[in-house]
From Swiss-Prot:
Exists in an autoinhibited state in the absence of substrate protein, due to interactions of the leucine-rich repeats with NEL domain. Is activated upon binding to a substrate protein. GO terms for molecular function: ubiquitin protein ligase activity; ubiquitin-protein transferase activity. The gene is ipaH9.8. Keywords: Host cytoplasm, Host nucleus, Leucine-rich repeat, Plasmid, Repeat, Secreted, Transferase, Ubl conjugation, Ubl conjugation pathway, Virulence. It comes from Shigella flexneri serotype X (strain 2002017). One of its GO terms (cellular component) is host cell nucleus. Ubiquitinated in the presence of host E1 ubiquitin-activating enzyme, E2 ubiquitin-conjugating enzyme and ubiquitin. This is E3 ubiquitin-protein ligase ipaH9.8.
Length: 545
């Protein structure tokens, strides 16, 4: 950084004489502003950066993370990028007309000044904005999430990406598309939007609109689903959720939420145990999740469900690692609809079983471990199928799609971790034919791919390390010998064959491929040996219907 001399004088005819205000005017104003600093502000550093920007005629000015409560009125007139994020700003001064990118996230702004006519990127998320000024026609991207905005001004035709999550919007802006080729992605999740304007259909089918967790009326949802399901629909893809966006953010103490799942004669002891976990990360959201779980279809209709949850909670209380994993999995489950809670319960049961397998529960029961692995494999394939299905839908709640495949195929595919009922299957877009095709695909891929998958599965490796230490050590030695003797040549041969010798990115990719192939070969051989021995001893079999 250049040393700053407040008495520095510029030579005559410098470029500074051509911009608004003189060099001395800038320095004098900035020095005065610096002297008015509040405790904790790094205005000295800010002034140093301002002067350096002016001296070097830089087009970027970065004053972020300096705990500033204000900015000087006269910013360098030549800048095209201004970053003042993560300060304590309540307002911004007049902005240079040359500005193209404005970053002012995580401040305390309640309003914005007039925006420069050439502005292309506006990033003002996490502020206290209640409205926006007119948006320039040049604007391409805008993030206004986590503010208090009630309505939006007209959107520029050029705007490609808009993030307006977590505001107080009650309606969407009007969309006018015409022949505009811009592919747009707009996020309006978690607002107060209750209806969708017909103008949304003016957008191209390559565009995406996200409106999850809004209080959309059932009439609006039905109308949109009917319209977007039409064979001649060519509008945008619309992501929604069955949540009404009105989840209660209040929660009761963790111990109270847990003890509610236990019989009265156990509640005192359970409460005492769980009081110790009140301050663990995500404990509050886990408490809210348990209360939401008690109101799901499965909790109301499935015999033994409460006992199942209580047994699971006992296991969590005995394992800090499992509890930490489970709290994290449940962290976002209360921010969406009932079926999101149900899908999270599925994932929590998977987490429990995989944890138990890794900790040794199935060390002496290879058949049970294979069954668990097979279920995890089937669930992975169903997730792939659900992901592909989501891409085909124009009006989609992703949660309902993922849960639909698990719930509707739980019995046929023997999915012990899947709930047997869901509330909103009707809006999932998953048809009976989709389910038949999915079942056939799972069985086909299981027949051809499961043993390879199982040989690389982490819990199986944990079992091998504990119970087949010598064989595991031999396999690891074989792998490292290959890395030392064969790996470099195999990577070089692959790069040469593809004409990419000397390409660093291609070398990394080729190296990863060779490593995967080597591990697949070595661990598959080890798996075949161990399974052949164990399954012949207890009469189990690798393939399962």
């Amino acid at each position: 950084m250049l040393p700053i001399n407040n008495n520095f004088s510029l030579p005559q005819n410098s470029f500074y004489n051509t911009i608004s205000g003189t060099y001395a005017d800038y320095f004098s104003a900035w020095d005065k502003w610096e002297k008015q600093a509040l405790p904790g502000e790094e205005r000295d550093e800010a002034v140093s950066r301002l002067k350096e920007c002016l001296i070097n005629n830089s087009d970027e000015l970065r004053l972020d993370r300096l705990n500033l409560s204000s900015l000087p009125d006269n910013l360098p007139a030549q800048i095209t990028l201004l970053n003042v994020s993560y300060n304590q700003l309540t307002n911004l001064p007049e902005l240079p007309v040359t500005l193209k990118k404005l970053y002012s996230a995580s401040n305390k702004l309640s309003e914005l000044p007039v925006l420069p006519p050439a502005l292309e990127s506006l990033q003002v998320q996490h502020n206290e904005l209640e409205n926006l000024p007119a948006l320039p026609d040049s604007l391409l991207t805008m993030n206004i999430s986590y503010n208090e905005i009630v309505s939006l001004p007209s959107l520029p035709q050029a705007l490609k990406n808009l993030r307006a999550t977590r505001n107080f919007l009650t309606e969407l802006p009007a969309f006018s598309e015409g022949n505009n080729p811009v592919v747009r992605e707009y996020f309006f999740d978690r607002n107060q939007i209750s209806h969708i304007p017909e103008s949304i259909l003016n957008l191209r089918n390559e565009c995406s609109i996200h409106i999850s967790d809004n209080p959309l009326s059932s009439h609006a949802l039905q109308a949109l689903q009917r319209l977007t399901s039409s064979p001649d629909y060519h509008g945008p893809r619309i992501y929604f959720s069955m949540s009404d966006g009105q989840q209660n953010t209040l929660h009761r103490p963790l111990a109270d939420a847990v003890t509610a799942w236990f019989p009265e004669n156990k509640q005192s002891d359970v409460s005492q145990i769980w009081h110790a976990f009140e301050h663990e990360e995500h404990a509050n959201t886990f408490s809210a999740f348990l209360d939401r779980l008690s109101d799901t279809v499965s909790a109301r209709n499935t015999s033994g469900f409460r006992e199942q949850v209580a047994a699971w909670l006992e296991k969590l209380s005995a394992s800090a690692e499992l509890r930490q994993q489970s709290f994290a999995v449940a962290a976002d489950a209360t921010e969406s609809c009932e079926d999101r809670v149900a899908l999270t319960w599925n994932n929590l049961r998977k987490t429990l079983l995989v944890h138990q397998a890794s900790e040794g529960l199935f060390d002496n029961d290879t058949g049970a471990l294979l069954s668990l692995g097979r279920e995890m494999f089937r669930l992975e394939i169903l997730e792939d199928i659900a992901r592909d299905k989501v891409r085909t839908l124009h009006f989609v709640d992703e949660i309902e799609v993922y849960l639909a495949f698990q719930t509707m195929l739980a019995e046929k595919l023997q999915l012990s971790t899947a709930v047997k009922e869901m509330r909103f299957y009707g809006v999932s877009g998953v048809t009976a034919n989709d389910l038949r095709t999915a079942e056939a695909m799972v069985r086909s891929r299981e027949e051809n791919e499961f043993t390879d998958w199982f040989s690389l599965w982490g819990p199986w490796h944990a079992v091998l390390k504990r119970t087949e230490a010598d064989r595991w050590a031999q396999a690891e030695e074989q792998k490292y010998e290959m890395l030392e003797n064969e790996y470099p040549q195999r990577v070089a041969d692959r790069l040469k064959a593809s004409g990419l010798s000397g390409d660093a990115d291609a070398e990394r990719e080729a190296g990863a491929q060779v490593m995967r192939e080597t591990e697949q070969q070595i661990y598959r051989q080890l798996t075949d040996e161990v399974l052949a021995l164990r399954l012949s001893e207890n009469g189990s079999q690798l393939h399962h219907s």
